[in-house]
């Protein structure tokens, strides 16, 4: 063996040692990074609105710490995103990745979901809350008399439009593009009652508390109430949703916020006066305690995943007939992806006021 060979061997040996050390350091850093990622506390961003009485479940879940409690069980926490009138819409906040979960009028988002809004619903929260009025001197007696009429609504994609179109279909009044026998006009919620009173429209559709306040202030006559009408009385108007990103990256968080909102809804059902007090005292909703609590008491806040899905499916099928959803949309697939069952989430809850405990509803309500 020549002397020249030893430097070569030595160089190779040193190179192997350095390579092995580098691999060890990279693996060690990678493991540390993964450990840091695993221990980092995840945050679920939840939308809420002020001024909306039937948003009571979200308000209660926030103020009674139900979101924090459920998320803390899995080492996570909640943050809240206020959706304000005149600002970015809920759909825009979802699309820009600023909201992970929340609650609202599900029918308002059906077209957006069909067009790619990445959310799925996980539970029905409450029924009712949308009402339709005419002036006291109007010759309109029911939905059957609405052919050729102007209808004021909070928005052309609002659930008040979707619900009424379904009802109009039932009584034979055209609502499709090629046979449209009514005209919907959009107004801000605060201007709806004025528009009806001034004769700019023949009918208005509004959500409480705006609806009932307008009725009392102007003496309007109610022709349809989704809280009592036989078609809608067992259908949810407001439902819980989660984004597809949350479902993919944090399914445990999605389940936690769903349970929290179900519990909060059950609390409102059992304690409407206390729920109204919490809303007013925290400046989440204005108004009188007696007035607000009576409106909450009129609504059905018993949550249900099964009945929520049944509601979603019924609306999707009929709104396709109405031309709201595309004729080529596969409704079965639309429902399957638009409404999901999360592991660890019961069908719903009831709240035992005497014991201060939440009891799981295991049997499907639908």
Question: What feature does the model see in each segment?
Answer:
Residues 37-38, 135-151, 175-177, 248-252:
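Flexible hinge/capping segments at coil-to-helix
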Residues 39-55, 76-82, 120, 148-152, ...:
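Short, well-ordered beta-strand elements
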Residues 39-42, 111-122, 169, 213-228:
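Ligand-binding "clamshell"
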Residues 48, 52-81, 95, 111-115, ...:
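Short, polar/charged alpha-helical segment
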Residues 54-56, 61, 84-119, 131-141, ...:
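Pocket-flanking alpha-helical
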Residues 107, 138, 178-181, 185, ...:
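Pocket-lining segment of extracytoplasmic ligand-binding domains
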Residues 249-328:
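Secondary-structure end/capping motifs
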Residues 320-366:
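Conserved C-terminal helix/tail region of periplasmic/extracytoplasmic solute-binding proteins
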């Amino acid at each position: 063996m020549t002397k020249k060979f030893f430097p070569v061997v030595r160089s190779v040996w040193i190179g192997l040692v350095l390579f092995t050390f580098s691999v060890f350091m990279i693996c060690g850093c990678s493991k540390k990074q993964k450990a840091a990622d695993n221990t980092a506390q995840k945050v679920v961003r939840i939308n809420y609105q002020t001024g909306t009485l039937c948003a009571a479940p979200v308000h209660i879940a926030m103020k009674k710490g139900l979101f924090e409690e459920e998320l803390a069980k899995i080492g996570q926490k909640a943050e809240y995103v206020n959706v304000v009138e005149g600002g970015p819409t809920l759909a825009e906040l979802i699309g820009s990745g600023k909201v992970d979960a929340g609650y609202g009028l599900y029918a308002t988002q059906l077209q957006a979901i069909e067009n790619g809004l990445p959310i799925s619903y996980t539970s029905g929260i409450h029924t009712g809350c949308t009402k339709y009025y005419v002036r006291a001197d109007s010759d309109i007696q029911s939905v059957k008399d609405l052919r050729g009429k102007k209808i004021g609504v909070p928005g052309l994609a609002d659930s008040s439009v979707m619900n009424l179109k379904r009802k109009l279909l039932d009584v034979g009044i055209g609502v499709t593009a090629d046979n449209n026998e009514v005209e919907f006009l959009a107004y801000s919620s605060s201007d709806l009652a004025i528009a009806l009173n001034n004769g700019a429209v023949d009918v208005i559709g509004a959500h409480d508390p705006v609806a009932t306040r307008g009725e009392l202030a102007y003496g309007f006559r109610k022709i349809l109430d989704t809280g009592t009408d036989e078609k809608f009385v067992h259908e949810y108007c407001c439902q819980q949703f989660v984004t597809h990103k949350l479902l993919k990256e944090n399914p445990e968080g999605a389940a936690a916020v769903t349970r929290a909102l179900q519990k909060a809804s059950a609390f409102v059902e059992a304690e409407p006066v206390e729920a109204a007090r919490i809303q007013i005292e925290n400046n989440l909703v204005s108004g009188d305690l007696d007035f607000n609590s009576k409106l909450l008491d009129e609504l059905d806040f018993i949550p249900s995943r099964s009945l929520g899905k049944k509601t979603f499916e019924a609306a999707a099928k009929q709104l396709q007939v109405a031309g709201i959803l595309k004729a080529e949309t596969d409704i079965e697939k639309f429902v399957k992806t638009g409404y999901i069952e999360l592991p660890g989430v019961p069908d719903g809850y009831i709240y035992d006021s005497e014991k201060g405990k939440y009891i799981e509803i295991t049997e499907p309500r639908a």
